[in-house]
Amino acid sequence: MTDEPRPDPIVSLLQLGQHREALATCVREHGAVLGRTCMALLGSQADADEAVQETLLRAHRAMPTYRGEGTIKAWLCGIARHVCAHMLETRRKGRELALVPVPDTDHGREALAARQQARALREALAQLKPSERDVLVLHFVAGLSSREIAIAINQDEAAARKRISRALARLRTALPGDSL
């Protein structure tokens, strides 16, 4: 038995030049996290779906030049982050962020509290700079490590950790009471 790490199947497919198969595997393994990430950054399911499609299209085009730095998940989230930023710039939509989706069908006291908490979080997130919001979404929604976030935002790991820490501090300041 050996302790050698197994190569990522997507990287293996890329090395073999099997880009179509690699893309299909990306969709299966990372499609859901891309959807959640784009939804959190854009606040609209329709926009998030469009952003995921554009992310996968750009990833497919970039596959021949993939350098293998970091994880595929971090690479894809980095592309998604750029796609979402471009969509926000060009469309200039004042949509709310949907980091904490709450179904509208439940009318109980708990549902009301959850909706109020979600609204407070969206409002606090809207006060952050896009770069601060991005790292929080990559960390809490996409589940990326600080190393993976560093790759996604093209900075070293220490800078990524610092950005996450500062963004959390600003978010805590923006939230009423002890909501976080």
Predicted region positions:
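N-terminal module of bacterial RNA polymerase sigma factors
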Residues: 1-33, 40
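C-terminal edge and immediately downstream basic/flexible tail or linker adjoining helix-turn-helix-like DNA-binding
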Residues: 2, 100, 114-115, 120-123, ...
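Sigma70-family region 2
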Residues: 15-16, 43, 54-71, 90-94, ...
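Amphipathic, Lys/Arg- and hydrophobic-enriched alpha-helical face
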Residues: 27-45, 62, 125, 174-177
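Residues within the DNA-recognition helix of helix-turn-helix
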Residues: 30, 51, 163-168
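Structural recognition of an alpha-helix C-terminal capping motif at a helix-to-coil junction
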Residues: 36, 50-57, 70-82
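Arg/Lys-rich amphipathic alpha helix in sigma70-family domain 2
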Residues: 61-68, 78-99, 113-114
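Helix-turn-helix DNA-binding module
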Residues: 126, 130-134, 142-162, 170-173
